C-alpha cells in the first residue's frame, strides 16, 4: 500500500550530507503518487521578515514577527515565497482580516529542479483536498490535513502588513520537491526518518532545537542515529 507522508516530518539521516538537507527537518505539505512537496523548517536565511516585507514594498504590521528569519525552504524556486501557517479560523487570526482575496501569485507545481536534479512533481495548490477543513480566505492556498495551510498568494503578506493574518507563520523562499517515487526511494535508501508532524516543532521550538525535537517524536536522540543504522 502506498505511503502518504502529508503532514509528516522528514528528518535527515547523518548520511545526507549536502548543504540543503544536512540535519534538516522537512515539513511535508503534500505527498501523492505524483510526487511530494515540502518545506525545510530549520534552515534560516540571513533575511528577516521585516527585510522581506521591505523588499516587496509592504510594511510589517506584526512586531512579533519583525526579527523572525525567512527560511530556506528548499532548492526549487528560491525566488518565490511560501507561507506556512495555521489553518485560518477565528481563533487563529490576529486582528481584522479582509475575506476578499487579491489576485493569486503563480501557483505551486511548475517544473523545477530539486537537490537531486530530478524534476519536481506537478502539484497544485488549487486541486481538491480531502481535508474537512474549511477553505482559506486567501487566493492561492493548499489546505493540509493536520491543521496547517501553505499560501503562495500576496494577500497573506498584505494581511500581515496590516497587523492581521495568521497568528503563527513560517515564511520560506523555495521549497523541496520529489518526482514520482523519488522520495520513497530515498527513504528505502535510509536517507530520511519519518514521523507525524507536530506544529509545535515548527512554531514553538527554537530553530536550533527543531532537529532534536523532531527526533524526540520518535523517541530518539541525535547520538542514537548513525549512517546505515536503519529507519523508523
List the model feature ranges, each with a label.
Residues 95, 109-115:
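Residue-identity detector for glycine
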Residues 1-98, 119-171, 176-232:
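A short aromatic-anchored loop/beta-hairpin motif
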Residues 104, 113, 117-118:
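Short Gly/Ser/Thr- and charged-rich N-terminal loops/segments
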